[in-house]
Amino acid sequence: MVTVAKARRSASPKGRILGTRVPAFFPAKGAVSAIIFGEAPGPNGADKSKIPFFGDRAGRPLYEALEADDRVRFTRPLDQVRWDGAALVEAGIRPVVSDVALSNAYPVCPTDDGEHFRAPTKAEMSSPENVRRVRAELAKARRRGLHSVIVLGKTADWLLGTHLGLRDDPDIAYHQITHPSPLGLMGMAKRAGKGVRVSTMKDEWKRKFAEMLRSKP
């Protein structure tokens, strides 16, 4: 998943970006109490796996937190497979979620040349097509009992919280949390004070995320 708020270009080290349109990932059945929005599919993760966050660097702590909260299981063990979208697909591994849905503020890994990824622009995110998509995903989740929306990072917060106004929705517990990428966790560690380890912030991120999952308006 893209981890910067500005359109800074970064090379994808594992081949060309496919430009895969990654749909929201819902449970096959049952309630959906929370929906989680990231920024966009990452070049080595969801762009290859076609599942939000799956194989993205920031997706690892997210899926670990969901697994600890009994919100996800995997079709095969993960311990022998590299955390990478293409590798996970090749190994036949898929997540099976319950009570939670996963999506992104923008459904395609943004790129200008097929090799470098960047953050989605506000114009891209606020396009009529993209807004219709996000509203449809939210409506689907509401029909299944949605009461919590969690966004990762400032870019997704701009679309969901500001542009679509969910921050002021009385029927939704709306939360923004730091993006759990290495850069995001390093920022948390710096803000926490000198000597605080990134691994400690990863655990703290998971704790806060679990609280948000269970929150209600």
Spans of features found by a protein language model:
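Solvent-exposed amphipathic alpha-helical surface segments
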Residues: 69-73, 167, 212-216
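A polyanion-binding, active-site-adjacent surface
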Residues: 1-148, 155-164, 172, 182-186, ...
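A polyampholytic, Gly/Pro-enriched intrinsically disordered region
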Residues: 192-215
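Short hydrophobic/aromatic-enriched beta-strand-loop microsegments
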Residues: 169-179
